[in-house]
Each structure stands twice: as C-alpha cells, then as structure tokens.
C-alpha cells in the first residue's frame, strides 16, 4: 500500500543511523541544530513527498540558541586568551627574577624597565579581554532573558497555527475526497491522491473539540470559510504531479466526511481506505513512536552535549588552575633552590675565611712562642756565661789568695749562695715571663693585666676592711 510504503520509507530514513548522522551534520552546517519533523505529508505521482513546515517560533528559538552558542564559544575563547596572557605574565615574572638574581645594579635597572613595559602591556591586554568577557556574559544573560520571555508567547502562537493548519487540511480533504473516489473507479495508473491518515485523525479530533465547545460540528464550515478567506491559496494546493483537483461540494458534517473517506480508493490498484486503514494506522503509529523516540534521543543528546560542554569547561578551568598552581610551585621551588645555593656558597666562603684566619693566628702564636723561647734561651746562656766567668774569677782569686783560705771559702760560699739565688730568681723570672707573655700580646691584654694588678693591690691594702665587712655580713647582729 502507498501509505504503508510511505511509513516504511520514513521509518527506514529515520532508523538508519549513518544517514541520520549525515542529515544531522548537514542541518548543523546550515545552522539548524535540531531535526525538523514533518507536520504535513503530501503524495503525488510515483514518489513520496514530505512537507517540512517549520513554525516561526522554532526558527526564533534556533536563532536564539545559535546566538547563545556563538556567545559561549566566544566566552571560552576569551577565557583561554586570558589564561594564556596570565601564563605569559607569570613566565615574564619568573624570567625577571632569574635575571635580577644574576645581574648587576645597572643591568637590574634596565631589566626592570623592560619587565615593567611587558607587565603593563600584558595587564592592558588582560583588562581588555576581561571587558570583552563581561560584555559577552551580559549579552548572553540578555539573550536568555529575552528567549524565556518570548517562549510563552510563541507557544500560544504555535497552538493557533496548528489549529488553523489542521482545519485547513480537513477542508482540503473534504473537497478532494469525491475526486479520489472517481479516480479510484476510473483506475488511472501512477496517480495517488489519498491524503495521509493523520490528516483525517487531526480533522476528527479538532471536529470533536469544536463540537464540545460550540455544541455542534456544523460550525466547522464557517470556520473553514474564515480560514479560506485568511489564506485562500492554500486550499487549491494540488496533491499529484499531473493530476488536477476539481472542487467538489463540501461535506456538511463530520459523518459525511467520514463516509467520503471510507468510500475513497487509491489509484495504484489498492482497496478502499477502510480496508487498508489498519496497516496504514499501524505504520503511522510506528512512525509517531519512532519520531517520539527520535525527539527523546535528540533531547537526551542535547542534554549530554550540554553536560559534556560543562564538563569540558570545568575540566579546562581546573586544568588551568592546577597548571597555574604547579607553575607557581615550580617557580617557588626554583627560587628556594637558588636561595639555598646562595646560602651554601656563602657558608662555604665563611668557613674558608675562618680556616684561613685560624691558620694565620696559629702561625702568629707559634712564631711569638718561638721568639719568646729563643729570648729566654739567650738570657739563660748569658747567665751561664756570667756564672762561668764568675767561677773562673773565683778560681783566680783562690789561686791568688791562698793565704786567706777561710775568707775565700766564705767568699766562695757566699758567691755560690748568690749564684743559686740568682738562678732561682732567673727561673722565677722566666716562669713569670711565660705566664705574663700571653697577657702582653696586645694593648687590651696589657690594660687588663694592669687593672688586675691594681685591683689586687687595692684588695691587699684594704684586706682588714674587707674582712670586717665579710664578718658583718656573715655574723648577724
């Protein structure tokens, strides 16, 4: 049957996923992001024709959606540009810090001037991009608010247009039904003027609605006449390619219309509409179910696309934040590493300087001790020479004065005692010199020694007073 063939053709067209994907891509290239569903089906000749009639409200909705999508794309682009500018600014800051750490004062001043110019340029560009971003956000909010206010008005307009279109189709059906019967009886091949089933279903539904509202279905003719006066050229639209529609008297009521449709037949050799209505109704029901499923799939796909875009935006935002944080941590780590290297170098230099100073002090102390020991040795040698001279002199005196043995013996003993005393004195002097020599290294040591001796003298002089004071402090009254 032609009706079933039409339903199967539409079913195959919408059920084949590859073709549906290609059709969707073509529609997206022509700025139509949604699948427009057929609102009226007309048949003529040997081909099946689909009449795609898109309401103005849907087109306005698509325009608003396309404008909002373009604004969202611009917002994403501007956001990426802002992130790029911020990363370049951070890179300039890191490079400036590295160059300043390794540069002189003059070079640091020049580098600072260049960095300030770059920083001002990047700040200006970021400010401009932020202004653009705010403008795009404001436009997007305005478009969303305007689209929400228009949608309630467009819904009522679409309902009125659907009612007018269904009544007009019912009027055309009632005028072309007798002609369909004649063509089926004459058996003209290649021409099929059978209107779609859902036209009759729609006309009956609206007839029932109007009957419930106005009390009778006879007022449909008046509504049809008003619609014909509103758009008279739509009623004279032909269904076949070479067939001519002859205007016939209208049916007076819904019963006549139903009887006319039940008696009509196709020109392709099919039975009457009443006989093949079941298969056509099944095909049309399947088509409606498939179209409803396609709508649900389309809505689900749109929701998934929005969720994916939201996830992409969130992922990009989080990725930019994490990358910026990692970059800041890397720059901080590099700065800390440079500071650590500088501190280690400074400590190494300080330890080297301390080692050099300790070595020089040790050399000085060793040299001074050597000089002092040599001086003491020379003094002892001089004393020994003097003692030897005195002994020689004593021997000479003993040889000369043999008479005065006792006197010489006494004199020798005295001299020995004196020499021993002198030796003790020299040893004491050398020992005192060894203890005093560290106190006489510098002026500070000399002053400290002088003050210590002075305090000791004062302490010895006032020893009685000190003892009295101690007794007063210890013994209570």
From Swiss-Prot:
Q: Which residues form a coiled coil?
A: 112-153, 282-398
Q: Where is the composition biased (Polar residues)?
A: 258-273
Q: Where are the transmembrane segments?
A: 417-437, 450-470
Q: Which InterPro entries match?
A: TEX28/TMCC (IPR019394)
Q: Which residues carry the post-translational modification Phosphoserine, per the record?
A: 46, 253
Its main subcellular localisation, reduced to a broad class, is: endoplasmic reticulum
**Superkingdom of the source species:** Eukaryota
Topology relative to the membrane = Multi-pass membrane protein
Which Pfam families does the UniProt record give? Tmemb_cc2
Tissue localization of expression is:
Widely expressed, with highest levels in brain, spinal cord and testis.
Subcellular location, record wording: Endoplasmic reticulum membrane
Q: Where is this region: Disordered?
A: 168-188, 249-277
Q: Which GO terms describe its molecular function?
A: 14-3-3 protein binding; identical protein binding
Assigned GO CC terms:
endomembrane system; endoplasmic reticulum; endoplasmic reticulum membrane
| Keyword field | Coiled coil, Endoplasmic reticulum, Membrane, Phosphoprotein, Transmembrane, Transmembrane helix
Q: Which family does it belong to?
A: Belongs to the TEX28 family.
Under the subunit heading, UniProt states: May form homodimers and heterodimers with TMCC2 or TMCC3 via the coiled-coil domains. Interacts with ribosomal proteins RPL4 and RPS6.
Protein name per Swiss-Prot or TrEMBL: Transmembrane and coiled-coil domain protein 3
Q: Which organism is it from?
A: Homo sapiens (Human)
